[in-house]
């Protein structure tokens, strides 16, 4: 991987793309530390260790701690992710959107435009929720007497804070699009990657704090560290795994030349959806707790328990729903990315066939069965990686007084490793286009 980046750096065009991507990430990190008018940034964050394992920890992880400190990019890219999920689900249910999504490049641009506008609407709604949240945490500036603003100044304060967070959401979306157009990697993934990496020192510091407590932690922390490193190797292995469907092309005579006749294969990856199922599953599970910022409900009531206890990352209910959502989104995006009918039709048009399988419907059925099996295997492996830290946290709680929160560890590692591998592959393809040998050669 490092050799790939070194070789890419030697190419002027790729070096410019890498520098541009680094510049965008730097701007994002500056925005993540930039204060908002009327908001008093807490030196130790809005919530502390008592919030460990809750959805607040997840949002803080996804935003690189910006959510915890109430800075400009506190909402980060989460409104855009949620908007993408909703629009793509609606595209399956609404014929007009489904037709638009199949209209090629123009249709894709229109769908992206709809997603952006919807993301702004969600960003505005989440900004209102976040305003009430930081207000409940006494994070808003007060008058000279230490009292909250009233009347006109209270309204002005609310408008400024909400608009700033909405503008922050729009700016993060724009930064992601700039990476897509002029940089390297996927914009959304790179921003999430930057946020998670920025939070790594805090995660490492938390592990050291567990060690200071002594006792069983002297055994549990090293095991957790070794397991997390092992997860990295496992994710790399899973990402490189694929099923090769043999393809045989018939010979064709065009004029005086003969074409085809070669044998090749169609690769079907184990983890064909990458990190998307994990990102989207986590984002969907954060929607209800976000709504709870508006209406926390009665203390001890069903709604309050659902959003504060059951949807906490360390609760078995959360783990079960998380597992189901990962599998659902894995199948959902596999269905979007791969169309067995089109794949079989393309083979027929190019005089290709799968040995032992008749063209037409049998080929479609064969490809569909393989896709379903590979999707299931990939989804289960992805779920195991995502769930392992949650299960380990539960086991650690049996042997220690304070427990051990590693709930977001699996999600973080999957996103980081997945984004790094996707970026490496994109660099490899760029170098291959320029006839430059890279790591995979």
Task: Give the location of each predicted region.
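N-terminal cationic and glycine-rich segments that engage phosphates or anionic surfaces
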Residues: 1-101, 106-441
